Amino acid sequence: MPAIAFLRVACPAVLLLAVSASTAWAQANDAAFEQWVDLYAQRMPKRAEDCTPQVLEPFKKAADMVESWAAFLARFEGVSEGADVLARIDRLLAAKQRIDELLDEGFAMRGQFIEGNIDKDRIRVWLGVMSNLIDLSGRLKLQLSESVNYAAFRVASDATLRERLVDLCIRRNSEVGAAVVGVLILPPPPQAPQDLPPVSDATKLRIMELIAAAGERSQLPRLAQLIRDPETPMELVVHAVDTIRKIGLPQDLRPEDVGNDEVDPPVITADEVFGLLEGVPPTRLDAKTAELRKELLEWLDYRRKHGLEGNSYRLGHFDVQPGDWLLMRNPSPYNLFTDLHPGLFTHVGVATIEKGSDGKRRMVIVDLPERGSRIPAENVEAYISDTLHFAFLRHPNPEYAKIMGDRAAAIIGNDSSFDLNFRTDRVLDLKNKPLDGVAIKTYCAGLLLLCAQETPLPRQRFFPIPETARGGNTAENMQKLGLSIGKDFISPTGCLFSPELIIAGRVTPLYEPTREVEEMVFDHFSYGLENKIFTPSPDLYQSLRVKLAEAAEQNPVLAEALRKKENIGREMDLVAAAKTQAVVETLDEVAYGHSDLFTMARFAVTCGDLDRLPGLGYSSEQVEQFRMLRQRHQDLYERFLKGTLMARDLRVALVKYYGEQGKEELDRRFFREQ
């Protein structure tokens, strides 16, 4: 049965090839795209004092226009010559580069907000600006990926133009370009046209240099395939291994994860790379490449036997070190709970070195998840594999960084309980105390404080902005959930304003429309908590679970059985956990259910003849659901058939529709009129 995940990947490319012209856009001023990019940059606040409420709406309007024009240019309407296709690609690459520069400039402003009096109104405006920048960068990245793929297809049969496309990607140091032209390092697949001009080894080397410079880890599978191919020229094998080293050779699985079907194995291991490179005769290489081979073999030999040699792990275009704080951004129901919103990051972890039972040293992330009864650790590259946007913060003092890394390492495997009251006082009680066997009860950001408080610096140097629950009815409604914002609360976003921490590394954001639907639902829940009366409506199973948790308060045997079944720590309040879980399950059902409907609706509009789908493996039930969704969106479908609907416009319309549907369902479930 075809998976929803496949549909999410397949639809954008289908739309790009299927959507044709619209006359209104075709007659517009060709320079409007760059003009809107410039206007977007002009409207961005440059200083903290510029962050006034009047900034946001014009800024968001400019972002919408930048994205709209990018989508229009990506249709390549009236562009027939390959050289003109490349000229348009260069415009899109330049715009993406400029937006990412603005994002860097925005993050550089973060320290200004703690100079003098702290003005949370200005901070919230800045957070709104940065959230918009992150979203726009991700949207343009998705659009650019489709556009560069199209350009690569258009110039595939012309060696000169193909080289120019590679040159464009190199000049712009484009990670999207690296991900697209990376396929050229491999032999053409059997189904490729036979008259395609061959790609020279020199071009393949340049592409590998681009992959390394951009830190494009998505190309690890292709690099692994290249060095496994016995037909690959030996010089290319050596340089492919060097490229893997530069973007980060995957670490071996932790011994605890070997044989666990839920943990994906690494794309390639140090041991396999060592064996493949050892099979390359140095006498068949020039002197410089032979010396590089020797250096790589020494590095790989140590790595396969002992793990990491030093105290850093290469992750794309930057290094991760022990004591670094990982900040992640994904859709979350907790993103708007505090007065420091919208949160730019929703979860955290701490990097540290772990020496496994096999004697190998690995860079891992330690975190405190909501579900689970022990502090987990996971290889850093695996931990961030599905994250839309993340950054690492670092204290530049190596001594302080080591203290924090050691503290994180000390609690791996300890009992844990997620504190639904988001308190930090239990963490304060652990200051300067050994942690062997100590149960950790806090929440994800509390883990940062657990590490930071061991340094000589006061707490305010790491978390300079006090946070409270969002206004209105938030605190009262949270109590009905079994939640509260504790005294001295800290959030994943709050540490971003620390004057002590630098941004050690950050990736450009990703965008996924299904995540946007989910975020709309989660954000509406937070809005409802602030402005409406929360009325929980658990289903029968959830009600019974709450009653069972209440009974377990007087029955230790039942309590222990419940904790094992629900995978929660010994210190967690069972009743509060049951109430919260009932709400979270409903939230997830609404958010993920509507994001899946978005995916199916987009496919229903764009997939063509529905009667051919059974032959492609779709069930009769799926086909009927697609037919129903096509009828629901008949107007969009007809516009798509006529060629008057842009890919972006279809996405925007469906995201809005299913986001609004999800919000209405939330109101029915939780915020019924009194």
Segments from the language model and where they lie:
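Cysteine-nucleophile amide-bond enzymes
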Residues: 26-674
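Bacterial N-terminal signal peptides that target proteins for export
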Residues: 1-11
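Bacterial N-terminal signal peptides
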Residues: 9-20
